[in-house]
Amino acid sequence: MEINLTSKLRFVFQSDADRKSAYDTLIAYRDACNYVSQYVFYNDFVLRQSELQSALYHELRKRFGLKSQMTQSVFKTVIARYKTVQTQLRKQRVWDGYKKDNHGKDVPNYIHKDLTFLWKPIEFKRPQLDLVRNLITASKIMCYL
């Protein structure tokens, strides 16, 4: 059985410098998500973490100054968002002209949407930070709560 623990936290900072540092981290994470989203959109919707990691990992670390876990979390966040949109699009049908049935009559042809129907990359607008921990760490955290 898989257990997921989701927490919303409210931080109270001791100084404005701490607040600015945390906000800068949130902005860097959001910008990295937008960067990876553009890469996915313009490179035939690559949704495999290993391919994204080999293409963008070092560049993300250098350009946005993210730590290793945050960089991996960027990939997971972008892939999850694109897969969610892909699932939502599959439910919609689009009329695609007519085709002939077995008796030679014209019948409407419908196709299901996929990610190629997107006009622009998915954009991350709000400052955010999603850290996904492994199951062992999560279970240790749950034991101490």
Regions found by a protein language model. Name each.
Residues 1-145:
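Nucleic-acid substrate recognition interfaces
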